Structure formats: C-alpha cells, structure tokens
Amino acid sequence: MDDYETPLLSKDSSSSSSVITSSLKWILKVVMSMIFVTWVVFLMMMYPEQLGDDFLTFVSSKTFLGTTGTMFLIFSCPILVISVLASLYLIISGEDKVFTKKKISKFPRFRLWTFPVLVDGPFGVVSAAEFLGIMVFSVFFLWSIYAYTLRNLDLLERFHVLPKNRSILLLEVTGLRLGMIGLLCMVFLFLPISRGSILLRLIDIPFEHATRYHVWLGHITMAFFSLHGLCYVVGWIIQGQLLELIFSWNAIGIAILPGVISLVAGLLMWVTSLHTVRKNYFELFFYTHQLYIVFIVFLALHVGDYMFSIVAGGIFLFILDRFLRFCQSRRTVDVISAKSLPCGTLELVLSKPPNMRYNALSFIFLQVRELSWLQWHPFSVSSSPLDGNHHVAVLIKVLGGWTAKLRDQLSNLYEAENQDQLISPQSYPKITTCVEGPYGHESPYHLAYENLVLVAGGIGITPFFAILSDILHRKRDGKACLPSKVLVVWAIKNSDELSLLSAIDIPSICPFFSKKLNLEIHIYITRQSEPRLEDGMVHKVVHPSVKLPRTNGCSMSVLVGTGDNIWSGLYLIISTIGFISMITLLDIFYIKRYNITTWWYKGLLFVGCMVASVLIFGGLVVVFWHRWEHKTGEVEANGNDKVDLNGEETHNPSAAELKGLAIEEDVQNYTTIRYGTRPAFREIFESLNGKWGSVDVGVIVCGPATLQTTVAKEIRSHSIWRSANHPLFHFNSHSFDL
C-alpha cells in the first residue's frame, strides 16, 4: 500500500493546484473584463452635456488628484491596471498550453476569430470578431460626432454674435471637438504596435497581425487631427490672423506652434505609410516613421499634461516595449552557419540560449550591420523549438536591395572559404547580426486542431516547415500533439523553389511517421507546363553551407517582452509603479510648491517622467534580468546535449530507425506535383468533405494578399452552405505586412 501513497498524494495535490490555478485565472479574467467594459461605457457616457464635466469637476475638486490626475485615472489607468493583471494571469498560466482531445469540442462550431466576414476591399480579410470591433468603433465615432455637434449648437445659441464671428466660433469649437476625438483614437493607437505587448499576449494576437489595427487607427487618428487643424486654419484665415496665430506659443492654454509641428510630423508619417508608398519605397516609410518621437513630444507641448494624460497609458506601454527592444538588440548574435539554395533563398542558423522559448509560428527581426545599422527586417522562423535548444533558423528570399546585399556577402564568404582565407580573421568577410524577438502567438494554436490545411505561396512555406517539424518531433517523442491529418498546399512559380524542401528532412525527424501522421503535400508549379529533368531529385540535394567562426560566443538575448513571464511582469509592474510615483512626487514637491502653471512645460515634464521611469526603474529590472539570463544559460548549457556545427542536437537513432530510414517512404509517396496550374481551393475543400467528415479544420495561410483573399472567400462560402457531415474550416492568416 505504501508504494501507491505517494503517487495518489501527488495526484491529489496536482488536482488541487489545478483547481486553484483555474479559479485564479477565472477571477482575473472577470476583473479585467469588468474594468475594460466599465472603462468603455464611461468613455461613451462622457459625451452627454453635463455628466462628463460634472464628474471631472467633482473628482478633481474633492480629491488630491487634481485635473491631470483625474484625467490620467479615467483614461490611462484602466489600461495600465489591465496590463498588470494580464502579467499576473500569464505568470499563473505557465509557459506552455497543452491541447488535448478533452479540451476540444466534439462538434464543429463557428469561432468569431476564424470566420472570415469580409474577404476583399480596403480592410483585407476581416474575421467576425474584427468586424464586430470595427462596428463598435464606428458607433463610437458616430456617437461622439453626434454628441459633440449637439454641444456645439447649444454653445452657439448661448452667444449672440455676428454671422461672420458665428462662423469662426463654429469652426473653432468643431476643430476642438475633432481634436478631442483624435486624442481618444490615440488611446488605442500605440497598443497594437508594441511587439511584446502584454495585452496582445493576453488575447493571443501576434504583433504581425496586430499591425493592421495600428494602420487602421493611424488613418482614423490622422484624419481627425487633419480636420482639427484645417478648421482652425480656415478660421484664422477668415480673421486675417493666420501667420500671427500659427506661430504663437502660449504659456497658459494651448501652445499652437508645437501643435503645428506635431501635425506636420504626423502628416509626413501618414502620407509615407500609404500602401503604394510603403510597398514601393519601404525605406522612405521606415525612416519617416521615426518622426513618431517628434509627434509625441510636440503633442505634449501642444496640449499640456492635462490633455496628454488621456493618451499616456498606451504611449507608456510602447516606451516600455521600445526600451526592452533596444536592450535586446544591442547584442550581436553568432551566425552558426549560412547556406544558399539553388532557388536563391538564403538560410541562416543563429545561436540562441537554451532558456529562450518560442513557438513554431514565431518570427524575428534581423539586422546585419555590414549592410545597414538602421534597417531591421522580419523573417519567419523555419525551425521548431524541438529542433534544438541552441539554434534558430530563418529562410530569406532575395527580393530587394537589402537581401541582394546579404546574398553578395554570403557569396564573398563562399569564395573566402574556398581560397582558405578563413584562417586570417582580418581578411574574410563577416556577418554581424543583431536580433529582436522572437515574437508570435502566445500559444501554439496549430496544435489546437486535429486536422490542418497549410496553404503557402512561394517563400510562405517557411513557417510551415517549423509546424511540420514541431508536430513530427512531438509524435516521435510521444508528447501531447493533437494534429493527426495535415494537408500542405504549396503554390510556386518555378520548380527551382522545390529545393526549399531540403530545409526539412521529414523521415529523419520521425522515422515511420506515416503510422503516426497522415501527411499530404500538394505542390502547384504555375509557370511550368512540364517537369525538368532534375526536378525529381532537387529536393534531395544537400547544398554546402559555410560554417562561420564563433566571433564572440553570443547568442540571442532573452530580454524580450514575449520571454520569461515573471521577469517581463516585474519589468512592467515596477516601471508602472515608478512612473506613477515620479509623477506624484513631481506634482507635490515641484509643480505645486513652485506654482508651475505653464502648460507646455508641464507637458514636457510629464513626458520626461514617462521616459525616466522606464530608464531608471525598468532599467534596474533589465540589469537583474540580464544577470539571471547568464546564470540560467550557463546551467542549462552544461546540462544539455552537445550541438553540432549546424546547430542541431545530436540524435542517435536506433537500429530499427536506421533500417526504417533506408526503406522509409520516399518524398514522392506523400508529395504530389502539378505543373501549369493553380490550386483550385473549392475542389480541394470539397474533396475533404468525404475524407475527414464533420470535424474542425484549421486552415493556416501564408502568402500574398491575393492568396489569402481566395482562400478566405472559399472558406466563407463553404462554411455558410456546409452540410452537417462536412468539415468546418477555420481561417488563420500568418502573413506579415508592415
């Protein structure tokens, strides 16, 4: 009996702990939801005539907060409180989310986030959840415009002025209201662009997907700000005081010149972020967008601390993320190996510490200092976390000037290696890389489906290599892995791109994988009507790679917002407490004591406190986080298996595996190649009706916008008219578009 007491006690303890954890998570979810809903409802109720003004007057006069503190409490504190609670939620949740059949619904059901409602147009593919969000914002804007219009008309009736002055007054109050709506848009503007945002991790929306929300909000915000400025300019022209007023810088009240500077910076960012400019002149867009610093600082000088506190919460979270990214990106990262495939695609294997965690659908930002110290480019990770603890791989397609320079740099390395110049470190070309990330989904959602359809266009196959590797490793090691049927649909232009298949060796990862995973790969070569002689073996060719010397022995830094939950939570909480403390102490011991009343100066002090709190309090956490990284990295490195030059952990297959590898299914057994045609997704989805039955099917698309639109349109049509015994397809996009 004694032999069974410990396991039983352990099981009871684990069950009790699970109940406590679930209860705490449920409580935190309820509290965060209540705070968010209350905050949004309160913002909507601020517009009626007297309610908002009366509340602000009451709180600011009856408490120690004052006007600035009251505005900060109403508009910014809810975001910061939700962020703090979100960090606690993620700490309690743990590192990994395991999907099992018990957690998955037995019957297919619609999901708001994966059902495409709009599949074409200016918004691209829009899910039902996103469509609801657009509707809520639309109602919010219409309601605010309506409420402010009523207030403007009521205000005009109170003043008996000449018709000319009446027009000027109407323009000025309209401009004031439009500026206020623009500020309310800015409350949300910086939340999606924070790459390691705790809020994005909470709702499991990756940064590459959230950027579209930033784009939408940016257009709306700048539209309101532009109309705001236009109303005032027209009014000043009517008065004949344009030059006099536009260069005024008032000590008390709104400082106009800083507002003009902020608006000009915003307009430059807005114009260069339009799709045509961004696509054809990305560097112009990228460098111009650094004017966000001018935009924010001069906005604070324009409106002062009182109004700037409305948008302070989102901007503060962005500054937190930006500082952490700066700290991570200062470290140079070793390139373990580099390889060029026949199709021109480059593969880089980068060194990473064993304690860095990421999901198969992650991506990184890469800088190569020999090419540019300013340019950072996003690339999907092609390796699985289970491929090895010490490396991460990316595939880079040569498309523009930066990637062409990288290809030339690798060519120089090949030549230097062939000429035996690598013996002299001073003579051979170098590749000095810096990395930000990894970023991506908080949970590996590809493991949430028993049935997967992976649709790729060209280099979009890269993240699917990571997915396949992740699934195969889990099947081989007996880990929790829900997917059992995977269909890969890959459209490419030429057969040269088949060489990308050499990036993953499926039989060597999981011998006899066909007994554990039903895998089909359908390849469509659109610009060739028939195969070339070498096409049958191109995927088997192993191309030589350059082994680069470990110049500094450095791997990627774990100082990332998506990294360790405890440290990222401490970074957020301590920095937030430090910011509020600095603002409070500054108000008590400086502003009130010395009777500081200049609006623009108080706005500058407010921004200074935001930056200083991140540098001082956040920097202190970063120092200890960095020390923890070194200690845990050394411990894990000593306890891990050795790594070969390609960055892969040594794996010794058994005799049965070796025999299996010799007679294992060839790639042709699960790969079908079609020439001169494009994927017919309606036929593909209909063919799965009888094969898979009534199940949930996760469809992940990585490719150009036209591919996403085509797939989303077929999924929407199939989902609406599907029979009860047919699969329900869930649309997921994994395409990155800045």
Curated annotation (Swiss-Prot):
Its cofactor is FAD. Residues 328-445 form the FAD-binding FR-type domain. Keywords: Cell membrane, Electron transport, FAD, Flavoprotein, Heme, Ion transport, Iron, Membrane, Metal-binding, NAD, Oxidoreductase, Transmembrane, Transmembrane helix, Transport. Heme binds at H214, H228, H289, H302. It is found in: Cell membrane. GO terms for molecular function: ferric-chelate reductase activity; metal ion binding. It is an enzyme of class 1 (oxidoreductase). Residues 178-299 form the Ferric oxidoreductase domain. It catalyses: 2 a Fe(II)-siderophore + NAD(+) + H(+) = 2 a Fe(III)-siderophore + NADH. This is Ferric reduction oxidase 6. It comes from Arabidopsis thaliana. The lineage of its organism: Eukaryota, Viridiplantae, Streptophyta, Embryophyta, Tracheophyta.
